[in-house]
From Swiss-Prot:
<feature type="binding site" description="in other chain">
    <location>
        <begin position="38"/>
        <end position="41"/>
    </location>
    <ligand>
        <name>IMP</name>
    </ligand>
</feature>
<feature type="binding site">
    <location>
        <begin position="412"/>
        <end position="414"/>
    </location>
    <ligand>
        <name>GTP</name>
    </ligand>
</feature>
<feature type="binding site" description="in other chain">
    <location>
        <position position="238"/>
    </location>
    <ligand>
        <name>IMP</name>
    </ligand>
</feature>
<dbReference type="InterPro" id="IPR001114">
    <property type="entry name" value="Adenylosuccinate_synthetase"/>
</dbReference>
<dbReference type="InterPro" id="IPR033128">
    <property type="entry name" value="Adenylosuccin_syn_Lys_AS"/>
</dbReference>
<comment type="similarity">
    <text>Belongs to the adenylosuccinate synthetase family.</text>
</comment>
<keyword id="KW-0460">Magnesium</keyword>
<dbReference type="InterPro" id="IPR018220">
    <property type="entry name" value="Adenylosuccin_syn_GTP-bd"/>
</dbReference>
<feature type="active site" description="Proton acceptor">
    <location>
        <position position="13"/>
    </location>
</feature>
<feature type="binding site">
    <location>
        <position position="13"/>
    </location>
    <ligand>
        <name>Mg(2+)</name>
    </ligand>
</feature>
<keyword id="KW-0479">Metal-binding</keyword>
<feature type="binding site" description="in other chain">
    <location>
        <position position="302"/>
    </location>
    <ligand>
        <name>IMP</name>
    </ligand>
</feature>
<keyword id="KW-0963">Cytoplasm</keyword>
<keyword id="KW-0547">Nucleotide-binding</keyword>
<feature type="binding site">
    <location>
        <position position="142"/>
    </location>
    <ligand>
        <name>IMP</name>
    </ligand>
</feature>
<dbReference type="GO" id="GO:0044208">
    <property type="term" value="P:'de novo' AMP biosynthetic process"/>
</dbReference>
<protein>
    <recommendedName>
        <fullName>Adenylosuccinate synthetase</fullName>
        <ecNumber>6.3.4.4</ecNumber>
    </recommendedName>
</protein>
Length: 430
């Protein structure tokens, strides 16, 4: 048995898709366990760039099972669109498996997401408006519709009718906007269910059987630890648990079967959406990092906020996710910056603190304590080993590993999978 979890250590967009794709080569099953099509993965495979939002990155390996776990929320319309996108590019999806226990995103979830963000105005969360939050709300309220329900027309119709009574009251009375008729949704979404029916099964059985047979299973997290609903910068978070612990709930695999957790990070920090960001750069260096790193959201197209590497954030991620291995991406983006900074702690009300605060008010008042390091000007995009890197780049990586307390296992010097380099295998026995 060999199981590896890939999690983002920051606010998402760390390059998890690329690392998952890279690690998928040596895995036999690849599974997502939380989130929905609010995630965005950009993957280069055989020289072609693909952008996925819902389907796991391992889909490009037709001999490997690719799982959408029970902890995900699935927009059937978006899924059909993504399947068509892959089919048009001659990518087989016969290896896809979808949990019959995953919850379904319906049009009223999308509408509620949109109007609630508008209502909040300046206090908005910065949601992708994909209906993720409202779908998870229904799940917690025990009125959600699952994939298994979607496949049974009578059950789907009964639950949809019940839900529309409540949702329409909410839309019309509170938000003063038009609701939905059952005929607006029933036939269209039931048909979507029929189109994906061949992929649907009990994915917990698929995953546990694979582990019991000694096969390598890779769990792909979406977003990042700082967007986790429990451990992140609440309320500026997603509605699920991207932390490694989310695997057990969102995939139906017990915690004793998880061996290694790979924390993926950029060599700097980015964030999409609102909320405090202690190391944010609003100067020319920030603009340079954004443009060189092409820091625009895969899902939203929004420019990402950028900042210096924050070891306080990544230490927090290490602790709450049990991270055993660090994968550091986008090192090449920092090339040409004369002096680099790493946040080693925060200064709050005159005191130096080394742990991430729970209070957003406190976080907003924190000032980063920086350690400066000399940069490098050499082209590092062809580096294959640590010794290929210039001395200053190597020292930067070593310092990041020291400050976060996570051994460096993978480093990346460009967007292509060939620019991803392994220092030690994450599939090791111990």
């Amino acid at each position: 048995m060999s199981s590896v979890v890939v999690v983002g250590t920051q606010w998402g967009d760390e390059g998890k898709g690329k690392i998952t794709d890279f690690l998928s080569e040596n895995a036999e099953v690849i599974a997502r366990y939380q989130g929905g099509n609010n995630a965005g993965h950009t993957i280069k495979f055989d020289g072609v760039t693909y952008k996925l939002h819902l389907i796991p990155s391992g889909i490009f390996y037709k001999e490997k099972a690719c799982v959408i776990g029970n902890g995900m929320v699935v927009d059937p319309k978006a899924l059909i669109t993504e399947l068509a996108y892959l089919h048009e590019r001659n990518v087989s999806t016969d290896n896809l498996r979808i949990s019959n226990r995953a919850h379904v995103i319906l049009p009223y979830h999308l509408k509620l997401d949109e109007v609630e963000e508008e209502r909040k105005g300046a206090n908005k969360i910065g949601t992708t408006k994909k209906g993720i939050g409202p779908a998870y709300m229904d799940k917690a309220a025990r009125i959600g519709i699952r994939i298994a329900d979607l496949l049974d027309r009578d059950v789907f119709a009964e639950k949809l009718e019940r839900n529309l009574e409540e949702k329409n009251r909410l839309l019309e009375k509170m938000y003063e906007t038009e609701g939905f008729k059952i005929e607006d949704i029933l036939d269209e979404y039931y048909e979507y269910g029929q189109q994906i029916k061949k992929y649907v099964c009990d994915t917990s059985v698929v995953l546990n059987d694979a582990l019991d047979e000694g096969r390598r299973v890779l769990f792909e997290g979406a977003q990042g630890v700082m967007l986790d609903i429990d451990q992140g910068t609440y309320p500026f978070v997603t509605s699920s648990n991207p932390v490694a612990g989310g695997v057990t709930i969102g995939s139906g695999v017990g915690p004793t079967k998880i061996q290694h957790v790979v924390g993926v990070s950029k060599a700097y920090t980015t964030r999409v959406g609102d909320g405090p960001f202690p190391t944010e750069l609003k100067d020319e260096i920030g603009d340079q990092i954004r443009e060189v790193g092409r820091e625009y959201g895969t899902t939203t197209g929004r420019p990402r906020r950028v900042g210096w590497f924050d070891s306080v954030v990544v230490r927090h991620a290490r602790r709450v996710s049990g991270i055993t291995d660090l994968s550091l991406n986008s090192i090449d983006v920092l090339t040409g910056i004369e002096t680099l900074k790493i946040c080693v702690a925060y200064r709050y009300k005159g005191e130096v603190i080394e742990e991430f605060p729970a209070s957003l008010k406190a976080l907003a008042e924190c000032e980063p304590v920086y350690e400066e390091m000399p940069g490098w000007t050499e082209d590092i995009t062809g580096a294959k080993t640590l010794s290929d890197l210039p001395e200053n780049a190597r020292h930067y990586l070593e310092r990041v590993s020291q400050l976060t307390g996570i051994p460096l296992s993978i480093f990346s010097v460009g967007p292509d999978r060939s620019q991803t380099n392994v220092i030690r295998s994450v599939y090791r026995a111990n």
